[in-house]
Swiss-Prot record:
Belongs to the tRNA(Ile)-lysidine synthase family. Gene3D superfamilies: 1.20.59.20, HUPs. It is found in: Cytoplasm. One of its GO terms (molecular function) is tRNA(Ile)-lysidine synthase activity. Its EC number is 6.3.4.19. GO terms for biological process: tRNA modification. PANTHER family: TRNA(ILE)-LYSIDINE SYNTHASE-RELATED. It comes from Tropheryma whipplei (strain TW08/27) (Whipple's bacillus). The gene is tilS. HAMAP family: tRNA_Ile_lys_synt (MF_01161). It holds the Pfam family ATP_bind_3. Keywords: ATP-binding, Cytoplasm, Ligase, Nucleotide-binding, tRNA processing. It comes from the Bacteria. This is tRNA(Ile)-lysidine synthase. ATP binds at S36, G37, G38, R39, D40, S41.
Amino acid sequence: MLHRPRITPAVANARRAMLNTLPADLHNQLVLIALSGGRDSLAAMVIASWVIPRLNGRVGAVVVDHGLQENSARIADEVRIRAEQFALNPILIKRVSPSRVSAGPEASARIARYAAFYDTLEETKAYAIILAHTLDDQAETVLLGLMRGSGPSSLRGMKAVSYTPEDCRYMNNKACNSVTAVYAHNTQRCSCDSRPYPPPPEPRNENRSYFPHPSCKCVEGSATRFTNADIDSRFGVFIRPFLDITRHETGKICEFYGLDYWNDPHNEDVRFSRVRIRHNVMPVLENEIGPGVKYALSRTAKLAQLDTEYLDHLSNELLDEIASKESDWSIRLPINTLQKTPVPIRLRVIRLAALQYFTVSLSFKHTRQIERLLCSSCDIKHVNLPRLITAQRVGNYIYMHTLRGKL
């Protein structure tokens, strides 16, 4: 009689977490695992190889080689071989060049990685990409956000299911073989991008507005707001089933399956903020406050997501009501309505107007400067914004327009 080893609590918890995050029936669609060869992604791979076939789905993998290590190509090939042992198909290796991106080392690698993910989604028509972020990663993300001082949005961390990477949207410019990022929240591709993606696993919010993909040339520079009616209902999904699973548990999963994982040297490089938080800050917090700090930070992220999503929903509804498109390059917002609006909603409306009509993500400083335009006695009458956008007070309205649409 064949003896099967009894699964460990870590394996059981991870299987349950992935089952609860994915749809009950994948209808034979492909789900890709983002593989790096580290313990978290290998744990996600073995769990997905058990879970996804039971949900009537197919499992593949995408390995992104950043080329930052001398032996990175060999490691990518070893990861591919390991994925083949667990019957993943297809297995794609994407080689990227973060050095082409004009950002910091961490941001450059992330931008290049997600650009490769988008290419892979387009190439394979996959339903989703599974990212192996853990509860520890979530806690570190919340602390990083607090360091940046980005308000409640810094507390919400990463979502279990998202339709783009958090905080950024990515454009892969194949013509010049470079990658650029436009910072935005909850962005989507516009209707001119007809990639045949399946519907997401959770109902869409019909009141939420989405924004054009950066590569969309048909609306470049225009004040065009995109809503659900303009968006193809099929697009790629990013899923993080392990946000309640600790890094210790993913190590136990690899141990159970006899997997040797790769330790990225960059995960020990204290030049990076996340590494300093992981190795210097979190241990101090755990020792001085208690071992439950990372769980508290993760729980805070969940609660903050609920609050910020509701405030964003109210802000979107108000923007729907008050924004008027004056031309292809200009919109206006009524000052009286904004003056009567509570400050948290008012600031969100201002940010959303810039984001949704002009794909510009405003800093706190720029948002406050636009808010000052509401004061008739203030000396400020216009504000220069990124990407040649200007906000200007004219009569009872605030106009936002591009350089082409200057009043």
